[in-house]
Amino acid sequence: MMRRATPEDRDLLVAWDADPDVRAAGGDDDWWDWDRALAEDVDHEEFWLAVEDDGPSGIIVLLDAAREPTHYWGDVEPGTWALDIWIGRPDRRGRGLGTAMLRWAIDRCFTVHDAHRILIDPLETNVRAIELYRRVGFVDVGPRTFGDDRCLVLELSRPDPPRCAPSG
């Protein structure tokens, strides 16, 4: 189940961010100001927790990359969304939760936000994440440096709607 993250989740998210594996996968520049992020109610970013029977296990962030105020992604077309995802609980990594969260977020971007393109930027060294993103359909855009982090930008384009054959 997915639910919106709230200010009450701040301490949990800070603890997840301190995990050495999460830090290694996230890079030096990829940390959220949870006090600000969870207190603001803006329509260009969403924070969702994956919640299992025994509590939250991971978080996924959905960003309208064209409207996001820091312009992290540079100048992108309207309808471009970006994702950031991590599994906070070590016992949940490598068990399919990230795939399920990613598929949920892709569906939300395309159906709720009418996105035409989704971007994601794992570190070039995060081979497992890159393989996952490719497996669900993302394609390489190319390497890019964000701050001190060497990333591989990948994108997923919205599938074209089916076309009806002309009658006659």
Which positions does each model-derived feature cover?
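Hydrophobic pocket-lining residues that define ligand/cofactor binding sites across diverse proteins
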Residues: C109-H113
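Conserved acetyl-CoA-binding loop-helix of GNAT-fold acetyltransferases
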Residues: G94-R108, E131-R135
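Hydrophobic adenine-recognition pocket in adenosine-nucleotide-binding enzymes
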Residues: A5, I87-G88, P122
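C-terminal "cap" of GNAT-fold acetyltransferases
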Residues: E77-T80, H116-L119, L123-V127, P143-G168
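Acetyl-CoA-dependent GNAT
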Residues: D28, D33-R92, R108, R158-P159
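A short, well-structured alpha-helix characteristic of acyl/acetyltransferase catalytic modules
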Residues: M1-A39, D160-G168
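Short, high-confidence coil segments that cap the C-terminus of an alpha-helix
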Residues: E45, D114-A115
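Conserved acetyl-CoA-binding loop of GNAT-fold acetyltransferases
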Residues: R134-P143
